[in-house]
Amino acid sequence: MKYIGAHVSASGGVENAVLRAVEIGANAFALFTKNQRQWKALALKADTIEKFKRFCKAHQFSPEHILPHDSYLINLGNPEAENLAKSREAFIDEMERANQLGLKLLNFHPSAHLNKISESECLARIAESINIAVDKVPNVIAVIENTAGQGSNLGYRFEHLAEIIDQVEDKNRVGVCLDTCHLFSAGYDISSLESCEQTFSEFERTVGFQYLRGMHLNGSKTPLGSRVDRHHTLREGTIGTDFCKFIMQDDRFDNIPLILETIQPEIWTEEIKFLRTLAK
């Protein structure tokens, strides 16, 4: 079964994200559990946690189909010791918040080496950061998102993801989220059914579908291999819609959250319906 939703606002309390997902006809969703542009946040209140869990149960949202995203400030491979420690502390807090809400996943952008350390050193720091976090917080899987490869950001090659995973001690506590806009911008062609098969076969060989814990379904405003991250709606932009058909008709993408981060929230309901029409 396909679980489709969007990254909805948690404004006014994380429990409201559940209701906003219901409004757009979703059976999966993503959210921030705190302000994504601040390092610190007030602790989740007991009544907020209770409402979130109650609303999820009432509307049949399973923890496996909810994909919280961490703060954009966090850089788990930061070359500077002080900033690395700050990022690790913030990531552990994000994991604790997810665990408090009964969630099983935490999506994050891997890192940027800032041209101060090598790619391998940066990837090793990311893996070490995951090891530290999962040792401190139970239950939650660290879900690495592929990137478009802007600037010194890593994670734009499948090999980067594999190198991180290889150095994570508990393989049950690490996973991957593939963003279709990022894939295309990084040079992985998904503009036809044939190119999708080639790209996802390469993913299987390099990383493995057993690690795929979610996807972000986005169009792109930039051409193949641009290394620029600019999301578009599903049916506009440079990729086309064959990738949507491929994903919706392939059971390797069953039972994971398929999350829209497209640029017009007002058409998310329509985009979710469109995706469902493509299913077998």
Swiss-Prot record:
Protein EC: 3.1.21.2
Record-linked InterPro entries: AP_endonuc_2, AP_endonuc_F2_Zn_BS, Xyl_isomerase-like_sf, Xyl_isomerase-like_TIM-brl
Catalytic reaction list: Endonucleolytic cleavage to 5'-phosphooligonucleotide end-products
Binding annotation for Zn(2+) 1: 69, 109, 145
SMART domains assigned to the protein according to its UniProt record, in alphabetical order: AP2Ec (SM00518)
Cofactor(s), names only, from the UniProt record: Zn(2+)
Entry binding sites for Zn(2+) 2: 145, 179, 216, 261
Record's cofactor remark: Binds 3 Zn(2+) ions.
GO molecular function: deoxyribonuclease IV (phage-T4-induced) activity; DNA binding; DNA-(apurinic or apyrimidinic site) endonuclease activity; phosphoric diester hydrolase activity; zinc ion binding
Disulfide bonds: none
SUPFAM superfamilies attached to this UniProt entry: Xylose isomerase-like
Biological process according to GO: base-excision repair
Binding of Zn(2+) 3, residues: 182, 229, 231
Keyword entries, A-Z: DNA damage, DNA repair, Endonuclease, Hydrolase, Metal-binding, Nuclease, Zinc
Any Pfam family hit: AP_endonuc_2
Superkingdom, taxonomy of origin: Bacteria
Function: Endonuclease IV plays a role in DNA repair. It cleaves phosphodiester bonds at apurinic or apyrimidinic (AP) sites, generating a 3'-hydroxyl group and a 5'-terminal sugar phosphate.
HAMAP family (alphabetical): Nfo
Entry similarity comment: Belongs to the AP endonuclease 2 family.
Annotated protein name in UniProt: Probable endonuclease 4
Gene that this sequence comes from: nfo
